[in-house]
Amino acid sequence: MSVFERFTEPADRVMELAWEEAERLRHDYLGPEHVLAGLARQEDSHAAAILRSSGLDTQAVRAGLDRLVAQGMLPARWRNKSDLLSSLGIDLDAVQRAIAESFGTDAVCAAHKRVLRRPSRREDLLIGTNPLNGKAMLAKRAFHLAGKEPDGLGQHDIDPEHLLLGVLRDALAPVSSSWRSRRLKRIRTYLGLPGHGPSPVRLMIEATGMGLEALMDEVLAELHATT
């Protein structure tokens, strides 16, 4: 069973919100920074409550993302594949909505998860592709790290709190340590992302005065308290 098939309904909702945040920024990929924004927007979860208590509500996370775009740490809004299709009279969002209306949201999510089964190549643990829109999934490593958290606690399902911990663990490493192969470097260059420096998630968290490790400890404490 893939990591994505273990997502609970709230975790699936986080994914939907994360893609919305990527689209808001006109980014042609889904990164851990977008997942962080999705977690902040899923307001009824323990993960969102922890983020709010650390000064990272939806407004603060969005402001952090916009600041990183202005600083060149994240890509500026650009004409992506969706824009190209729009210029040809094809509304990709409308196509996706029509698919969901025809087959049902649950069926679309299930198909998405089947396509995202764990591949064999090691570098493909870092990146995948959303089959519904063709965009890169740069947050894939964070998802696999999230999957290890319930395993260590004797649990199966992946909740928003596990996703948050996966995003934070992924942010511990500098960008260059996770993207060493030529293929992955080319992908980052194509997307307009820097190939070195701290993780955008780390930068957003530390901008609030909160340490990344301290926030991880808080999430772990919450997970153990609810186990």
Segments the model singles out, each with a brief description of its role:
Residues 1-227:
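Histone-fold recognition with a strong bias for associated Lys/Arg-rich disordered tails
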